[in-house]
């Protein structure tokens, strides 16, 4: 009896660019040997809009509304970095109150970013229930943003050179504290549902392992780096804004797998809540309604009319010129290090405006860590990286 030989040549499969678990318009050209991944080539660029070139043809005030559409889960972070770069180049001081307001917005955005990562990631690996819970919590963050900026998800257009566009509305800090009190137990609820679930743990433990040296050599940042045993957080390293005023810890794990990345993001949400609570209590001038009452009672000479109690140093004129020089400014977003290299030539628009997106760099290691895994693991590993194609393609 003759025995039929099975096919042994590799098979090439296309994932995306419109696959439901692709997290945007990413295409993966995957070479398979049976069920095993032999090679993977990411094809990017489907969402390229020329954001850097747009920046070089707009003034800063005109450009801020554009940037939140790059990464719609991290709009506030991109607004912050786009104003930080010219601010530092022109040595423009930021009032303490404005800095605290910025921190409040950034930490709310960090929680919103991690929630939008958590739901789809768990859905990718088969846990559907938390997917519906995360939108309930995000809705509360959107309500806070809508009260302060007028917009919910993107186009907040809130950050300005020297501060923010407007002070916090009356009662906003109380609502923010209410959110912190309400959200803390919800994180415990997620952990109860997921963290010690044996099916979930067997599904992702030991998957997509990245060692400490590998993470550093591939220039990873954010939870991808911290999950590999490198406690590197720009909020501690660069001392930007007023993060040094608060008591909080850098979340890190040592295993470097998908489960470690999940644990880091869960812990980061807890640390963000700690920062939010402290910022609400310590903000110079306190709630807006109290600050206004002090100013009205004490008149123009009141200490509460001083520089550090303002929400913006000085409103930026449309003719504000970015001085000669070049500078790289960076901050820690929910996905990692985002940065802007700006080159000014004493004009209202920058000569060069290079954007470093965290998920763009983090995505580069995907082919390296996919090799040897099963085809069913592709979505779990890709999901653990946390990419949004708007900022990868820019």
From Swiss-Prot:
Substrates-to-products reaction catalysed: a plastoquinone + NADH + (n+1) H(+)(in) = a plastoquinol + NAD(+) + n H(+)(out); a plastoquinone + NADPH + (n+1) H(+)(in) = a plastoquinol + NADP(+) + n H(+)(out)
Entry-linked InterPro entries: NADH_Q_OxRdtase_suD, NADH_UbQ_OxRdtase_49kDa_CS, NDH1_su_D/H, NiFe-Hase_large
Any one GO BP annotation for this protein: photosynthesis, light reaction
Pfam families attached to this UniProt entry: Complex1_49kDa (PF00346)
EC number(s) from the headed UniProt entry: 7.1.1.-
Gene3D superfamilies hit by this protein: Cytochrome-c3 Hydrogenase, chain B (1.10.645.10)
Chain segments annotated as transmembrane: none
Membrane-topology descriptor: Peripheral membrane protein
UniProt KW keywords: Membrane, NAD, NADP, Plastoquinone, Quinone, Thylakoid, Translocase, Transport
Gene Ontology terms: cellular component: plasma membrane-derived thylakoid membrane
Entry's Gene Ontology molecular function annotations: NAD binding; oxidoreductase activity, acting on NAD(P)H, quinone or similar compound as acceptor; quinone binding
Cell location: Cellular thylakoid membrane
Function according to Swiss-Prot or TrEMBL: NDH-1 shuttles electrons from an unknown electron donor, via FMN and iron-sulfur (Fe-S) centers, to quinones in the respiratory and/or the photosynthetic chain. The immediate electron acceptor for the enzyme in this species is believed to be plastoquinone. Couples the redox reaction to proton translocation, and thus conserves the redox energy in a proton gradient. Cyanobacterial NDH-1 also plays a role in inorganic carbon-concentration.
Family: Belongs to the complex I 49 kDa subunit family.
NCBIfam families listed in its UniProt record: PRK06075.1, PRK07415.1
Subunit text: NDH-1 can be composed of about 15 different subunits; different subcomplexes with different compositions have been identified which probably have different functions.
Protein name, UniProt field: NAD(P)H-quinone oxidoreductase subunit H
Organism: Synechococcus sp. (strain CC9311)
């Amino acid at each position: 009896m003759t025995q039929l030989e099975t096919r042994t040549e590799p098979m090439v499969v296309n994932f995306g660019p419109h696959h439901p678990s692709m997290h945007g318009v990413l295409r993966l050209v995957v070479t398979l040997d049976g069920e095993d991944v032999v090679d993977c080539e990411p094809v990017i660029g489907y969402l390229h809009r020329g954001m850097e070139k747009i920046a070089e043809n707009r003034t800063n005030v005109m450009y801020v509304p554009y940037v939140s559409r790059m990464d719609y889960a991290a709009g506030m972070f991109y607004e912050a970095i786009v104003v930080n770069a010219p601010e530092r180049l022109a040595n423009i001081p930021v009032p303490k109150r404005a800095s605290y307001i910025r921190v409040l917005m950034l930490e709310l955005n960090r929680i919103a970013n991690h929630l939008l990562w958590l739901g789809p990631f768990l859905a990718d690996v088969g846990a559907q229930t938390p997917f519906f819970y995360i939108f309930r919590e995000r809705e509360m963050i959107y309500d806070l943003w809508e009260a302060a900026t007028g917009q919910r998800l993107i186009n907040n257009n809130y950050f300005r050179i020297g501060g923010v566009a407007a002070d916090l509305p009356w009662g906003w800090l109380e609502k923010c504290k209410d959110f912190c009190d309400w959200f803390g137990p919800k994180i415990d609820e997620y952990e109860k549902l997921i963290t010690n679930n044996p099916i979930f743990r067997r599904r992702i433990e030991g998957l997509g392992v990245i060692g400490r040296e590998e993470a550093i050599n591939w220039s990873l940042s954010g939870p991808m780096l911290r999950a590999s045993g490198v406690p590197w957080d720009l909020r501690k390293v660069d001392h930007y804004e007023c993060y040094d005023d608060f008591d909080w810890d850098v979340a890190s794990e040592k295993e470097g797998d998908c489960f470690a990345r999940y644990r880091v993001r869960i812990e980061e949400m807890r640390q963000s809540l700690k920062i939010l609570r402290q910022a609400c209590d310590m903000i110079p001038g306190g709630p807006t309604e109290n600050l206004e009452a002090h100013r009205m009672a004490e008149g123009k000479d009141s200490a509460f009319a001083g520089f550090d109690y303002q929400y913006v140093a000085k409103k930026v004129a449309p003719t504000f010129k970015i001085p000669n020089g070049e500078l790289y400014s960076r901050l820690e977003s929910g996905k990692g290090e985002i940065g802007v290299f700006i080159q000014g030539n004493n004009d209202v628009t920058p000569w060069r405006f290079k954007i470093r997106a965290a998920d763009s760099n983090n995505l580069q290691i995907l082919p390296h860590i996919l090799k040897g895994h099963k085809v069913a693991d592709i979505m779990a590993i890709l999901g653990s990286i946390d990419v949004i194609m708007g900022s990868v393609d820019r």
